[in-house]
């Protein structure tokens, strides 16, 4: 057993001392939010809670995500001069620019009694979203991505507004992050040539 420990320690030392291989820099993109739309299957009262929360989390992610360039100040109008716009993106190191529509495909809120705690209950919030990106300029399909999250939060017998807001914000944040991860994975794939 001792020789095996020595071998493992030696391997760990070699790995730690080996020069690190730098990963290729991640591609940069520009996303513009066009709309956050609840699907008809989502109940109206739940959509009323989900839509502003999801929209706020999407806007925040588009501003802060390291792979996204939030502002393209000085960019030519893509509708009037598409070639100049594409050249501008290349000079700024932006791989692509997209109009993004977010659909809320699933949303639910449920209060569940906790059997082991008589004075508490659990708030369960579920959010599922679908992102669709269309290229700027041209409005051809660029990517899709799906994300979902379920948050379970212990609350008292009376549900406070801030508990509900926290649960919706948390679920929306995780669902948006999940969808963006899927989008970026698809955007990193080599493009098929027609």
Language model: regions and residue ranges:
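Surface-exposed short loop/turn segments
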Residues: 84-140
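Beta-strand elements of well-folded, non-transmembrane domains
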Residues: 35-39, 62, 106-108, 129-137, ...
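Second-shell loop/turn segments in exported
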Residues: 38-49, 118, 158-169
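Bacterial N-terminal signal peptides that target proteins for export
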Residues: 1-9
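A structural "domain/chain start" motif
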Residues: 19-79, 146-148, 181-194
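Hydrophobic alpha-helical membrane-association signature
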Residues: 54, 125-127, 171, 175
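C-terminal/domain-edge helix-coil "capping" segments
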Residues: 23-28, 132-194
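Bacterial N-terminal signal peptides
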Residues: 9-16
């Amino acid at each position: 057993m001792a020789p095996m420990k020595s071998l493992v320690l030696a391997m760990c030392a070699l790995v730690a001392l080996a020069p690190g291989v730098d990963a290729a820099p991640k591609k940069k993109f520009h996303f513009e939010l066009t709309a956050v739309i609840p699907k008809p299957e989502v109940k109206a009262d739940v959509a009323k809670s989900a839509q502003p929360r999801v929209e706020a989390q999407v806007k925040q992610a588009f501003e802060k995500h390291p792979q996204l360039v939030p502002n393209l100040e000085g960019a030519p109008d893509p509708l009037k001069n598409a070639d100049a716009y594409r050249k501008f993106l290349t000079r700024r190191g932006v791989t692509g620019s997209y109009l993004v529509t977010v659909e809320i495909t699933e949303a639910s809120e449920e209060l569940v009694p906790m059997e082991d705690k008589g004075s508490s209950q659990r708030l369960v919030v579920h959010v599922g979203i679908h992102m669709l990106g269309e290229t700027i300029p041209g409005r051809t399909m660029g990517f899709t991505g799906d994300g979902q999250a379920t948050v379970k939060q212990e609350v008292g017998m009376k549900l406070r507004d801030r508990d509900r807001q926290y649960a919706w914000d948390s679920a929306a944040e995780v669902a948006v992050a999940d969808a963006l991860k899927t989008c970026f994975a698809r955007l990193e794939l080599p493009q098929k040539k027609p």
